[in-house]
Amino acid sequence: MVKNQLHKEGEQLENYTKYKLKGRDELASVLTGTDNLFIIACNKCFKEFETVDEPDCDEFEKIVSEEGKTITGSAKVDFLCNKVQTERKLQDMIPEGTEHVFVISCGLGVQTVADMVNVPVYAAADSLNYRGHHGMALTKKSCDACAQCYLN
């Protein structure tokens, strides 16, 4: 976890980055044989707790488009690993015709989404390896922050 980055006004804020988008080659490999994708990203735990968008979602959408895949939709959810909140938000979020869901978050978010949908779910990000607590999950699930997500 990267800490103590300077804020725009010069004050110090914590950087809670816990994951990063997988490399382009690995994503291209995972995308093989998939289409009609829904992309969901955790909008917190990626950086400073500010109201800004998760940056990897746009980058992943670009890669998916370049691979010739159809995106059925995308969403950014605060604290994706919070099962109660995510379940409520996901109910009507994923459009009919979606065949695969790609999750941009740490392993907790991937596992939370996988438990809630009836299509294959893939990790599009790797957790950053650090000591400390991952996510805000109130379950027994865990993310080992291994820096190479093997949930696919």
Enumerate the predicted regions with their spans.
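Iron-sulfur-associated redox domains of electron-transfer enzymes in respiratory
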Residues: 2-152
